[in-house]
Amino acid sequence: MNWITNYVRPKINSILGRREIPENLWIKDPTSGEMIFHKDLEANQFVAPNSGYHMRISAKNRLVHFFDDGVYTALENPKVVTDPLKFRDEKRYIDRLKDYRSKLGVDDNILSARGTIEGLPIIATVQDFAFMGGSLGMASGEAIVKAFDTAIAEKCPLVLFAASGGARMQEGTLSLMQMPRTTVAIEMLKEAKLPYIVVLTNPTTGGVTASYAMLGDIHIAEPGAMIGFAGPRVIQQTIRETLPEGFQSSEYLLEHGMIDMVVSRLEMKTTIARLLRLMMKRPAVVTPSPPSPTDSQTSLSKTKAA
């Protein structure tokens, strides 16, 4: 059937003037099976409208929805040595990086930016799980440290959206070194008395959980996010016991006091803005109520009614 698909069908389409339908126009909700039009899903921040299931969202899309009017200024990530260990598994590490960079159009998995949320200036840092599983390496470590340095220099709070499978094995000890480096950067932010809020997204595991993802002043998680150090399968094989249902889910961690709150992505901006105002002792934003009708307007409406 390949000759029909590869030759006959395109020929017929070209004669009849039919256009090829792009893939992924409709995206399936994995919980309900509902098919959602991709533009509707993007407008809803990749949250399924009926089930509330939180799908993965790119770093750029997250920042567009997070900052006021979708306006932000990206911070340039520092340059680092590529593939210092000349690592190779099934594929050369440097080739793997080239593939991801070509596919996603970014150098690594960290995107940091400055902007405002409800008028408050902040620095936001987002890990993109699509780039090598959000793994923590030299490039991402340097980018995170720069974001903290920028927040301190500009006297802004920092909000970090974590999404990672852990340390990047292709960089060995150089990857693990980013854990204490980011920890020091956090301490410097706290010494400057600036807030640090962490949003834990699905998944947040490994060395990221063991470092900057769990050192915030406030920890917020998205619904249904998996958060932990080792994965549940590894733990179960190690201790040879059945784990509780929903173990490592954001709701389970909230119930057991590991995080402060679980917040929908649709309410994240408002929630974080409110928290930052409390932490920085800024006045609350008061939404003006609609003006009440004047006496003359009231009497006029009564006259018309009569």
From Swiss-Prot:
Record-level GO cellular component terms: acetate CoA-transferase complex
Catalytic activity: N(6)-carboxybiotinyl-L-lysyl-[protein] + acetyl-CoA = N(6)-biotinyl-L-lysyl-[protein] + malonyl-CoA
Keywords tagged on the record: ATP-binding, Cytoplasm, Fatty acid biosynthesis, Fatty acid metabolism, Lipid biosynthesis, Lipid metabolism, Nucleotide-binding, Transferase
Location of the protein in the cell: Cytoplasm
GO molecular function, one term: ATP binding
Xref: Pfam families: Carboxyl_trans (PF01039)
Domain CoA carboxyltransferase N-terminal residue range list: 25-294
Region (Disordered): 284-306
Pathway: Lipid metabolism; malonyl-CoA biosynthesis; malonyl-CoA from acetyl-CoA: step 1/1
EC number in record: 2.1.3.15
InterPro entries (UniProt xref): AcCoA_carboxyl_beta, Acetyl_CoA_COase_Trfase_b_su, ClpP/crotonase-like_dom_sf, COA_CT_N
GO BP terms in the entry: fatty acid biosynthetic process; malonyl-CoA biosynthetic process
UniProt record similarity statement: Belongs to the AccD/PCCB family.
Its biological purpose: Component of the acetyl coenzyme A carboxylase (ACC) complex. Biotin carboxylase (BC) catalyzes the carboxylation of biotin on its carrier protein (BCCP) and then the CO(2) group is transferred by the transcarboxylase to acetyl-CoA to form malonyl-CoA.
Subunit structure: Acetyl-CoA carboxylase is a heterohexamer composed of biotin carboxyl carrier protein (AccB), biotin carboxylase (AccC) and two subunits each of ACCase subunit alpha (AccA) and ACCase subunit beta (AccD).
Protein name (Swiss-Prot/TrEMBL): Acetyl-coenzyme A carboxylase carboxyl transferase subunit beta
Organism from which the protein derives: Bartonella tribocorum (strain CIP 105476 / IBS 506)
